[in-house]
Curated annotation (Swiss-Prot):
Keyword rRNA-binding belongs to the record: yes
GO cellular component terms, semicolon-separated: cytoplasm; ribonucleoprotein complex; ribosome
Protein name in the entry: Large ribosomal subunit protein bL21
HAMAP family in alphabetical order: Ribosomal_bL21
This protein's encoding gene: rplU
Length: 103
């Protein structure tokens, strides 16, 4: 059994017991979250596809940790002009463990 749900403007394909990194959520570690924006649920060979969401579909997850991803370096320069600009960015994320899928 797996499901596709939407969180933080992105779609995630998950199964029970899987740990997934999502965009940062303002929820404490150890809390339980319900995702109601379920786009598809698959059980064996049968599929339920929503238009846009599956009616009664829910993905339940437990927050495992919060953190920051690896640094992405941005470099901009103009040739022959002695101009160079460098910056870095680390995106915040929330790790969740999928505890239940229902449709």
């Amino acid at each position: 059994m797996y499901a596709v749900f939407q969180s933080g403007g992105k779609q995630h394909r998950v199964a029970e017991g899987q740990i997934v990194r999502l965009e940062k959520l303002n929820v404490e570690t150890g809390a339980t979250i319900d995702f109601n924006e379920v786009l598809m649920v698959a059980v064996g060979d049968t599929f339920k596809v929503g238009a846009p969401f599956v009616e009664g579909g829910k993905v339940v997850a437990e927050v495992v940790a919060h953190g920051r991803g690896e640094k992405v370096t941005i470099v901009k320069f103009r040739r022959r002009k002695h101009h160079r600009k460098q910056a870095g960015h680390r995106q915040w994320f929330t790790e969740v463990k999928i505890t239940g899928i229902s449709a």
